[in-house]
């Protein structure tokens, strides 16, 4: 399956719906900018040490307890979990993050009326800020985002039914990258397109 497949299916009247993180863009592009901001709050330690710690810990262990690990690894700093989370949830840049090449290619195949439909998990404010930070190069009124966590996070299906005109959808395709996305599609009985196949 390729971008051409998605283009062809859309021409047949099927709706394309997308996950956000690591589907449309690489999430670490955003996260590492946030980590740099958090590192800049350091007073007693070189911010580059903090930044490199956050990056390495995320790559090695994921995001679980990341800021608690930061606090315990740099006891001379007065890192506040609340302050770090606040930076995390409120950071945005002005269209500073590129979409993945496959997504740009897909959009170049679409008509000017194509609506980018996104269903994304995560803290709604942070996901909103990510959308604002991504260079989608598409009219804002043609971007529809459902913040699943405002209803029930994927793989629960409630978020799907928040899309405009969902009752008229014909055999939609959900484009994602994770087991959660795949389970979401199974519960909805819709096609899951694993983007990792073309990345």
Give the ranges of each region predicted by the language model:
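Acidic, divalent-metal-coordinating active-site segment for phosphoryl/phosphodiester hydrolysis
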Residues: 177-193
């Amino acid at each position: 399956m390729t971008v051409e497949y998605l283009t062809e299916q859309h021409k047949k009247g099927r709706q394309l719906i997308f996950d956000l993180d690591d589907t449309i863009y690489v999430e670490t592009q955003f996260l590492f900018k946030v980590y740099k901001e958090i590192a800049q709050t350091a007073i007693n330690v070189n911010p580059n040490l903090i930044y490199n710690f956050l990056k390495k810990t995320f790559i090695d262990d994921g995001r679980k307890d990341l800021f608690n690990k930061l606090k315990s690894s740099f006891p001379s700093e007065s890192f506040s979990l609340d302050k770090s989370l606040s930076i995390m949830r409120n950071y945005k840049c002005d269209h500073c993050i590129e979409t993945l090449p496959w997504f740009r290619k897909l959009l170049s195949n679409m008509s000017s009326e194509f609506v980018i439909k996104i269903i994304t998990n995560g803290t709604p404010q942070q996901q909103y800020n990510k959308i604002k930070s991504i260079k989608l190069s598409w009219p804002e009124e043609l971007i529809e985002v459902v913040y699943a966590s405002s209803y029930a996070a994927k793989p629960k299906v409630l978020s799907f039914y928040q899309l405009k005109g969902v009752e008229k959808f014909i055999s939609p395709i959900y484009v994602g990258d994770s087991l959660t996305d795949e389970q979401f599609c199974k519960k909805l009985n819709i096609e899951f397109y694993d983007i990792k196949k073309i990345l």
